[in-house]
Amino acid sequence: GCALVGGEMAEHPGVMAPADYDLAGFTVGVVDRPKMLDPANVRPGDVILGLPSTGVHSNGYSLVRKVIGVDGIKPGTPEAAAKAEELSRPLEELGGASLADALLAPTRIYVKPILELLRGGAPVHAIAHITGGGITENLNRALADDVDAVVTRNGAEMGWDVPPVITYVSRQAELAPNEACKTFNMGVGLCL
């Protein structure tokens, strides 16, 4: 007797056959209204903290599949075996990791560190999970209507490192920097 509302329908073009099924899981949280974070509390001068991602997380995989050339390859064929071998080779651009390993890095889950911050009384005004659309499209969900954010990345000294797998796929896809920022998390999985 529980309505599961919201969310999205997963699409798997070129991945799943008609008889295949997708098993997914999710969690739902409950919070007392006085403890809810409210974007209205975000004010000019607040600092945005970005928590690092482990790679592409769960977004941009349609583009990734095009870049790595796996669309249309039937599982169990010699072509599939050759592609698997190719994707398993270490790449210098990925610090010696294979593209397969870099793309399959598990999505970082932020629950524990966020709960520690909140329970410790840290003044967190809002949180934005950086998913499809990147920082460009997701940060606005955590801002008051009358507040804008300015995010700059000036390299590791004053910003953060973009995971090599994101740089690699963006370059292979010939994405302009602004398009890469709208497709991938660019190394930031969560903003506070």
Language model features by range: what are they?
Residues K35-G95, L99-A100, T136:
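Short, acidic (Asp/Glu-rich) active-site segment that either coordinates a divalent metal cofactor
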Residues G1, M16-L23, K74-L104, R108-C191:
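Glycine-/charge-enriched secondary-structure boundary and capping motifs
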Residues G1-S62:
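Glycine-rich anion-binding loops of enzyme active sites
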Residues D46-L49, V188-L192:
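Structural signature of the urease/amidohydrolase superfamily beta/alpha-barrel
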